[in-house]
Amino acid sequence: MAKLLCSYLFICMFVLSGFLVFSSAKQLKTCTSVIKLGHPCDIESCLNECFRVYNTGFATCRGDKYSQLCTCEYNC
């Protein structure tokens, strides 16, 4: 009976510690910025400009090919 109780307590401690680590993990914030290019927006030049300006490891771009405005999303 004592072995069963110790095993149960060990499993509960393991699950609780995993939950605490998961809940306290820092989440990445995503920021959005508008980049004005001198030519119609294309994804490649938007990504290059976003990486150059914000120096981040993650970036996505949106925009249309008729507008000179591109929307850049990056990790803050």
Swiss-Prot record:
The gene is LCR38. Residues 1-25 form the signal peptide. The keyword Disulfide bond applies. Disulfide bonds join 31-76, 41-61, 46-70, 50-72. InterPro entries: DEFL. The keyword Oxidoreductase does not apply. GO terms for biological process: defense response to fungus; killing of cells of another organism. Belongs to the DEFL family. One of its GO terms (cellular component) is extracellular region. This is Defensin-like protein 164. It is found in: Secreted. Keywords: Antimicrobial, Disulfide bond, Fungicide, Plant defense, Secreted, Signal.
